[in-house]
Curated annotation (Swiss-Prot):
Phenotype of gene-disrupted mutants: Fails to respond to starvation by increasing locomotor activity. Decreased basal levels of locomotion. Overgrowth of octopaminergic and glutamatergic (type I and type II) neuromuscular junctions. Increase in the number of terminal type I and type II boutons and in the motile filopodia-like extensions (synaptopods) which form during the expansion of type II terminals in developing larvae.
TM ranges: 112-132, 140-160, 187-209, 224-244, 271-291, 352-372, 384-404
Disordered: annotated segments: 440-464
Keyword Ligase among record annotations: no
Main subcellular location of this protein, as a coarse class: membrane
Stated name of the protein: Octopamine receptor beta-1R
Entry's family note: Belongs to the G-protein coupled receptor 1 family.
Length: 508
């Protein structure tokens, strides 16, 4: 029988006895005067209070020890309530400890992920800048955009990610309303500049692959400088001017933010959302997709053209063998150079495609949420989801140098040389058979020659170092010969008319 049932039965028995004019105590059955019934009435009231506390959930029904079978309640209501309060406080303390440990673990995970993204963006883009400055082969027109992109991505990490990291970790804004406007301006400015740089790189690659003969005339240093100037100036029209003047949001929200400096929210009006998202993402994204599609079409066409040239070269070789004409076959040698050139162009197109894919994966979710939340007033998004979307977009600034290092051999070799100069002890041991392909891809203008002269002067160097120096020198000589072949005039017949004139048996 539970405590609630026992109390109900005892209360009913006591009330009925009082109404009959006599009450029997719980220990015996003697009749007593009405004045002596006052303690019993108090005990009955105590029972009623127990019932009310149990009904309200303040006292657990399982407290069977509070009431013995056939015995009076010896514990007062106040004592039971006090004990129950102590139990509640103890349970709340254990819950607070569990919540505190889980919150600490969540903060640690946030710090680790955010710190990794910020460090990768800063160090990776700085490595790109230093590598292009140190190595002459990387100083080409395309890499002007790459270096400028690295500067924009590094500034995204320094000026935008750091403030967002403080909000994500602390959960509040601690820098005032003026710095709130500056942070939002820096965020929009450098993120838009990074996206526009990717758009310019896609246009540059389009002319380099689709119109290679006109490329030196189109992408001159003057035009590249003008493009970079526009890329760095145009985002200011979307960031500093409307944000600092308050045009980007509603009047009520602007006054609310100014009166509450501990709050920093980027809540925009519909007009600014449409214009800013179009200029920052949708228009550059459409341009990049169209450029890459044209590059893919051209790469596929040239690949078929190279296949036809290879077939024509094999037919010519077979005809010369049948006719026993001991003539040189320059077309076959030049055809190999053409294949090598096409292979490099396909790799460049593939790298561009990977950069574009990373760009769309990182920024598309954010801008979809951005435009939907701005146009839908009743839509509410959790703060955690908004923060995740922001940092997925930021991660694109850390991905670009990783893509260059992994998919571009020139940058991979330059990164290796730069890191070797910065951390010489990490690359102390010379590994045989490794790194030669990377060394052949770059010409650094003399360090290996200086190493060769030094080895000749000493004459008593170790065999390992001598082998490394000799292999480096021989690889440079071999690469010079290969470059001389690659710069030969392309005389491979490409059209059907030229094939027909060269060999009457050729058919398409």
């Amino acid at each position: 029988m539970t405590l609630l049932q026992r109390l109900q039965a005892m209360s009913a028995t006591t009330t009925r006895t009082i109404l009959e004019g006599s009450i029997s105590s719980f220990g015996g059955g003697t009749n007593e005067p009405l004045a002596s019934k006052i303690p019993v009435l108090e005990e009955s009231a105590s029972h009623a209070r127990y019932l009310k506390f149990i009904a309200d959930g303040l006292i657990d029904e399982g407290l069977g020890s509070a009431v013995g079978s056939g015995s009076s309640i010896a514990v007062s209501v106040e004592d039971v309530v006090a004990g129950q309060a102590q139990d509640i406080q103890a349970s709340e303390g254990s819950t607070d400890d569990a919540d505190g440990s889980s919150h600490l673990a969540l903060v640690f995970v946030k710090c680790f992920i955010i710190g990794f993204i910020i460090l990768a963006a800063i160090l990776g883009n700085m490595l790109v800048i230093v590598s292009v400055m140190r190595h002459r082969k990387l100083r080409i027109i395309t890499n002007y955009f790459v270096v400028s992109l690295a500067v924009a991505d590094m500034l995204v990490a320094l000026c935008a990610m750091t403030f967002n990291a403080s909000v994500m970790i602390s959960g509040k804004w601690m820098f005032g309303s003026v710095m709130c406007d500056m942070w939002n301006s820096f965020d929009v400015y450098f993120s838009t500049a990074s996206i526009m740089h990717l758009c310019c790189i896609s246009v540059d690659r389009y002319y380099a692959i689709v119109q290679p003969l006109d490329y030196p005339l189109i992408m001159t240093q003057r035009r590249v400088f003008i493009m970079l100037l526009m890329v760095w100036l145009s985002p200011a029209l979307l960031s500093f001017l409307p944000i600092c003047s308050g045009w980007y949001t509603t009047t009520e929200n602007y006054k609310y933010l100014k009166s509450n400096p501990h709050i920093c929210e980027f809540k925009v009006n519909k007009a600014y959302a449409i214009v800013s998202s179009s200029m920052s993402f949708w228009i550059p994204g459409i341009v990049m997709l169209s450029m890459y599609y044209r590059i893919y079409q051209e790469a596929d066409r040239q690949e078929r053209l190279v296949y036809r040239s290879k077939v024509a070269a094999l037919l010519l070789e077979k005809h010369l063998q049948i006719s026993q004409i001991p003539k040189p076959r320059p077309s076959i040698q030049v055809e190999q150079s053409t294949i090598s050139t096409m292979r490099r162009e396909r790799k460049a197109a593939r790298t561009l495609g990977i950069i574009m894919s990373a760009f769309l994966i990182c920024w598309l979710p954010f801008f979809l949420w951005y435009i939907v939340s701005s146009l839908c007033d009743s839509c509410i998004t959790p703060r955690l989801l908004v923060g995740i979307l922001f940092w997925i977009g930021y991660f694109n600034s850390a991905l670009n140098p990783i893509i260059y290092a992994y998919f571009n051999r020139d940058f991979r070799a330059a990164f290796k040389k730069t890191l070797k100069s910065l951390f010489p002890y990490a690359f102390y041991f010379c590994r045989r058979g490794r790194g030669r392909d990377d060394d052949r891809d770059l010409e650094f203008g003399g360090p290996s020659r200086r190493g060769t002269n030094g080895a000749q002067r000493t004459g008593s160097g170790s065999a390992e170092m001598a082998n490394c120096v000799n292999s480096t020198a021989s690889s440079e000589i071999h690469m010079s010969v290969m470059r001389a072949r690659q710069y030969a005039v392309n005389v491979t017949p490409t059209t059907d008319a030229q094939m027909q004139q060269l060999h009457p048996l050729y058919t398409n």
